[in-house]
Every structure is written in structure tokens, then in C-alpha cells.
Amino acid sequence: MVWRFLPDLQAIVAGAAAGFFLQRWFLPRYRPLLYPVLGFIGLGALLNIRLLFGAVPAQWEIGVRGLAFALAAAFVAAFPVGLLVRYRLKQNPDPLRRKILQAAVAAPIATMGFGIIAARFHPLLVERDLVIPGLPADLHGLKLAQISDIHLSPFLSRRELARAVDMVTETRPDIAFVTGDLITGSRDPLDDCIAELARLKASSGVYGCHGNHEMYINAEQYASDLAAMHGIQFLRNQRATLRFGQANLNLAGVDYQPKGKPMLRGVAGMVVPNEFNLLMSHTPEVFSTAQGQGWDLVLSGHTHGGQLNLELFGEQLNLVRLFTPYTYGYFVEGRSRLWVTRGLGTVGIPARIGAPPEVDLLRLVKG
């Protein structure tokens, strides 16, 4: 199973190499500081491939691993800038120019620091009207709240989750949705996460679906049972009917749908003709299949909005776009709609840049 860790190890090695050359080119006097930095990155690699599993307390393990990845990523981002600066300095070694260009090399590292320290702590309340042709009149104005990708861990505390739960509850939604990834790994406080989510209030109930991180630790059933004790119903390839006036809302949820396998198998039969059909799926990759099956609205998360995102000329640039076109926002295909939230937490690198955390309030509007 070593192959599972190869991408992470490649990232760590690339980060260490980039840090080595950046120090050699621009900070030769600070070479003694380089070795502890590279050692810290190496420790993160050992923790990631579980060579020290159990020897380090869970919070320390997750913290060191996350910060090591953040440092490696910052060095990788700064490296191409460093190459360009080095080339320019060879052409014109003016001392003032050198200082300005060296500051440019530090910019990606400083940005990563901001993403770790500040940008991931302040969730936004994103409000959006979803205009849906043919929406039953009794569903017009229905308020749907969504919270997703919590990843409760040393990098997102219970107190921060409580703040997000309060934001959702204050909107007084008709239905609240929890769309997966409550935690990241087996050593994260799943029970605490569900206990905090139990404070969610919605007039017609709180519903959820599971994400890939519950699947990774085989915790879907445990989390579902515990959540049910707190009044939260996780739908695992199941449906429920919610009545609003003379209209039915047919709500369904699915467990995580792995890429490369058939999507939404056995789910088409849960679509109810002449009702508004809403599907919860952690991954937005199901959308094309859902559209073919007749789902009116899909609520998803999973992508974190790219997590490390750069907006350039109106385009969102991030690694997630290499894997899915559904990175963030509202999408329409035929009569079907998809909403993808940026969610709350982080995974891998404990930073958010250009993709602030959020909770969502969506209003159904008759088109």
C-alpha cells in the first residue's frame, strides 16, 4: 500500500528541494536555519506514511504533518518566482532591484502564512436564490441551509464549528443539510463534531450524507447511528418525503461516490415524478448522472472551492479544476441544478487562499 503515499511523498520532496535552492540562491547567510526546516518537512513525511504512527499524540501528529505540507507547498509556489528573479538579477544586479525582487520571492510564502493564520478562521454566510422553473408554489421561498466539509481536527476546533452552527441556526432555515466530511481521520473527534451539529435547528429537520473521509475510516454507520440519537438523519442511499403545504419535497442522500466507478447505482428509482427531487451527494461528480435520472437539485461539497485558489481574469485557478469542472458555485444542466459549497475545513494543507470557508443559505425561487 506504499503507492498510496507516493503523491504526498513527491510533494514533500519537491518542497524540500525548492526550499534548499531558494535558501542557497537568496539567503546564503542563513544556511544553519535550513536544516531544521528541512528536518521538520521530513518529519511531516514520516508522520504521513505512518512510520511514527502511535508514537506521537494525535494532535501533534496532525499539526506537524499539516504544517509541513503547508511549508512544502509554499516553497514549491515560490520556486518559479525564484527562478525568474535569479534570471533578472543576473541581467541587472542593482542592489535596490535585488531587494524588491527578493520580496517577490517571499510573497507566496507570506500568502501561505496568511492562509494558515487568518483566512481559514472566518466563515462567510453565503446567500443565494436558486431560480427553478416549474417549482411548486408551496416550495417558493423555502430556505435551505448547508454546512459541509467540516474536518473537525486540530486545524478546526469545536469552538469554530460552534460559530458556524450558530450562523446556520440564526438564518432560521426550513431544512438544514450536512453534506459530508465531518472529520479527516480516525484520530479526529467525530463524537464532538456530531454533538456540536446536534445544535442545528431547522423547522423541517436536519439531514445529512457522508463524505469520503467517513468512508476512509469505515465510520458511516457509527456516525449515522450517533447522529440519529441527536435528531440528525443521515440518508444512506435512502429517501424521505417532506410536506410543505400541497407540495412534496422528495429528499434523498447517498454515500460517497468514488470516481471511476458507476455513479448513483440504484438511485434512479428514488426519483418521484411530479415532485421536487433533491439529492445530497458529497461529491459533485454525480451531477451529470443525476441530471439524466431527473433530480431537480443536487447539494454537494468535497472540493473546498479549490482551497488554494487564484482568480485571474475571471477564471478560478486551482488544482481541483484538473479533476472536476464543478469546483464551486451554481451549475445548470437541462432542468437540473447543482450547488457546490466551499465548506468549512481544510485537508492536507491547513490553509485557505482565495477560497474562504462558508456556510450557505439557499432560497428556492419559482422561475
Which positions does each model-derived feature cover?
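Non-catalytic terminal accessory segments
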Residues: 1-121
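N-terminal signal-anchor transmembrane helix
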Residues: 88-107, 114-146, 153-166, 170
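Soluble catalytic domains of enzymes that build or remodel membrane lipids, polysaccharides, and related
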Residues: 135-367
